[in-house]
Amino acid sequence: MDYTLTRIDPNGENDRYPLQKQEIVTDPLEQEVNKNVFMGKLHDMVNWGRKNSIWPYNFGLSCCYVEMVTSFTAVHDVARFGAEVLRASPRQADLMVVAGTCFTKMAPVIQRLYDQMLEPKWVISMGACANSGGMYDIYSVVQGVDKFIPVDVYIPGCPPRPEAYMQALMLLQESIGKERRPLSWVVGDQGVYRANMQPERERKRGERIAVTNLRTPDEI
């Protein structure tokens, strides 16, 4: 079958590739600067590096941890998000993933490990048991890890799928990219300015209300 490639300007002599305009750069210095120099804000560059190189400290307590480990396999390849470097020590990690049921005897251990992590640090609560105690409404189970440590992202499910864990990583990366630091040690409020993360239920409420055709279970 005969085919042709249409250029942006059919009469142009300097169009090397289709749909791409080739510009002639007269100054070689300007050409090298455009290739090697990036102009931007410092906190944007720092946040870009942090959100794409998260080092998780996994704290598996129950079956949710099995789903988390599944995301490290070749099928899901969580390395695409830069979060595949598991650390054995909390002093080398900046993300703690609490996956599973948190018992009362385990809460002080999690608290101590969280305190050993260096700033900036984030926490993901994975699964219904870690979020709210799940089905274990008894004296020996903590009704949510947010009772003693701050949580940035909650993953619902019993247990949640590996895709849910990867979605939580992307939401956390989006939040890290919006963080801001004070201008100096004496100007402005000290600490990290973190963006207010809107719950997915509220963010997608309008989209779900507007749905008219429901998908079959085979299409989900």
Curated annotation (Swiss-Prot):
Q: How does it sit in the membrane?
A: Peripheral membrane protein
For the protein in the UniProt heading, the enzyme class is translocase
Where [4Fe-4S] cluster binds, per the record, is at C63, C64, C129, C158
**Entry's InterPro entries?**
NADH_UbQ_OxRdtase-like_20kDa (IPR006137), NADH_UQ_OxRdtase_20Kd_su (IPR006138)
Instruction: Specify where it is mainly localized.
Output: membrane
| One term under GO cellular component | plasma membrane
Q: Give the cofactor note.
A: Binds 1 [4Fe-4S] cluster.
A Gene Ontology molecular function term for this protein is: 4 iron, 4 sulfur cluster binding
UniProt keyword annotation of Ribosomal protein present? no
Give the location in the cell.
Cell inner membrane
Q: Which UniProt keywords apply?
A: 4Fe-4S, Cell inner membrane, Cell membrane, Iron, Iron-sulfur, Membrane, Metal-binding, NAD, Quinone, Translocase, Transport, Ubiquinone
Known cofactor(s)? [4Fe-4S] cluster
Q: What is this enzyme's catalytic activity, as reactions? A: a quinone + NADH + 5 H(+)(in) = a quinol + NAD(+) + 4 H(+)(out)
What are the recorded Gene Ontology BP terms? aerobic respiration; electron transport coupled proton transport
Q: Which PANTHER family match?
A: NADH DEHYDROGENASE, NADH DEHYDROGENASE [UBIQUINONE] IRON-SULFUR PROTEIN 7, MITOCHONDRIAL
Q: Family per UniProt?
A: Belongs to the complex I 20 kDa subunit family.
Q: What is the role of this chain?
A: NDH-1 shuttles electrons from NADH, via FMN and iron-sulfur (Fe-S) centers, to quinones in the respiratory chain. The immediate electron acceptor for the enzyme in this species is believed to be ubiquinone. Couples the redox reaction to proton translocation (for every two electrons transferred, four hydrogen ions are translocated across the cytoplasmic membrane), and thus conserves the redox energy in a proton gradient.
Protein name listed in UniProt: NADH-quinone oxidoreductase subunit B
Q: What is the lineage of its organism?
A: Bacteria, Pseudomonadati, Pseudomonadota, Gammaproteobacteria, Enterobacterales
